[in-house]
């Protein structure tokens, strides 16, 4: 066989199909425009709408090399020759053009004539009832019948990629590597055997059907071809390698890993696993970060975090003591940057984010591994780790569950995942409760019942803030009632409403619902099921019956303030992407009349200069008084536009686009100002971290900004008077005061230390003797923490050998203690154990090592008892 480099194979494939009339397209993003998928998992994913028949193809023949990512078999990566997280898929696609005959013929032609793979080493498989494909292989390609296998749905049926979508029977091509070492029946080995001898290198899917969520099949509008050829596998077999990691795709990456760790590949099997894991995950990490994904605790960010932490763990197995991925990522970028220039463009970002995540995990991993190893030793031959321990490793040490499972599986131990999930859900529920948000159980039975006869509520609030409607239904608690009285808290339903229901981060409208004999305050408005909107109200006056007509009136002042903040949120999102980078993605938002909150993916705090730039950019758009243009498009049209959207959200077939000139364009169903000038003024109050990889900006607009400025003005005026300074002198004046305070605190510490050490010589001269060791116990008062510890140090030095126990009572009746034990004496008495026992008696806690410990307690009145009975607290 002729040797081809990976670059040549990729280029030859695309050129071959270009010659066959295919349009060559660049790889689509790893982040699909598909709410069912976290990542692009196959070459056909970007073309799902075309396969479905929802979108007409611009080209009926397309060829691509698509970057893909899968993590469903992550535990196998490194342990097998062919499992990967990131991989490339070569593809040729036909949308209602050619079908089985041409697809099979061209696959064979490329493999045997272009790449020169020996025909005798190739086998084919077809779906068990696909006689047409079988006959093409037999009669047209001339493969011997015994080399054409019929398989069932598990092997030779592809799709859908997600819960629903296009699918169909497929035909696969296998390469015979001749590797029979693992085969139990070498003479009769075929691709049906899973020994690893035969490698699937090509899959032609005859996409003829659509599968719904129940697995029901219906014919697609046209018959299509979807070819997926594993690039890594083709490179390996073309280059005469059994293992993908031995191909030139991984050569430089593995060489760099060997250089960093001083290890050799293919010498030690367990080290080979770690080398392969790091090589594979480095590619995935580089591509994910280049797509703007940041490590976090959910979604795509969680996958990235898992990959980095799994790579770090395998680095630690190769004796890494700190971050090491940077130069490996550099090698990945150098190797693949020519094909995927986004890697070169985002190189600094890739290395920065990876380094920060590595550094963070290295800080906790050693303690986490120590904790896990201790737990394993104490399992006493049990084969299941309690879920609460796995949760502790996740919550305290940052160990993703699958990493804990992988480490334990190496020792034959499982995890109680049910208990882990219960604890995780409990933590999330506590977080939800702490948020104070009104929660609706959309699955409660009464909502399921009304869903059967109520139609979706029409929202008319884009154009109207009031309307007269007929009450369709009244719910009180969990029951439908015919009427309700003053003081009742009920839910009202109408065919139409001007009240905005909470969604997309925007809070619901407030207001009133009334008629001549009835008045209710609107507390909350929420869509419950299938766009049916519930109005939670408190009856202030009178009573209400089913079928009555009432007037619905939105609080206009609150609505207008909310609109200002919502439009400002769009401006903020775009400004962040312009100032910080396009990796910024919305991670959440809260838009209310009083303020706005915007959560976004980013790996470090914003600088003051960046915050100023963002504020300036937004206020510049406000001053321009730009019209806010709102229009409707089909979802597929919107996806092809330069529009910001959370495509993992579920949108309808028609979407609403909010456009602010060329500065911002987002999919949004919320309410907005008609002109940016209405916002008035935008001011950032705070920028903070809410979780790893996610930051939050809180801001205000309009009159709230004016009130804020007025309040600051008042504070500055008062400060100026208090300091007897002009405003521009205030910073210098405060700096001078702080400097004076710092100097005085230093003097106080020195005086405290002098007073504390005054009696040291006397204490050292009259120690107690316990079990042959000198012990000094004393109580001091109101010492600074470092003075307290230093005093104990000096006292032990004076003592020479023995134990020093110093209590320090503060003004708030709390007590702290320091225990110091000389090295020789630590064989008899343990400082940490002494501190723990005393602290427990004093109603507190603490501890430390054999020679030094600190603790505290709340029962200062018990210190005297401890001193009098110190023998009882001396622990080995």
Curated annotation (Swiss-Prot):
Keywords: Aminoacyl-tRNA synthetase, ATP-binding, Cytoplasm, Ligase, Metal-binding, Nucleotide-binding, Protein biosynthesis, RNA-binding, tRNA-binding, Zinc. Transmembrane segments: none annotated. GO terms for cellular component: cytosol. One of its GO terms (molecular function) is ATP binding. It is an enzyme of class 6 (ligase). The keyword Protein biosynthesis applies. Catalyzes the attachment of alanine to tRNA(Ala) in a two-step reaction: alanine is first activated by ATP to form Ala-AMP and then transferred to the acceptor end of tRNA(Ala). Also edits incorrectly charged Ser-tRNA(Ala) and Gly-tRNA(Ala) via its editing domain. This is Alanine--tRNA ligase. It comes from Petrotoga mobilis (strain DSM 10674 / SJ95). The lineage of its organism: Bacteria, Thermotogati, Thermotogota, Thermotogae, Petrotogales. The gene is alaS.
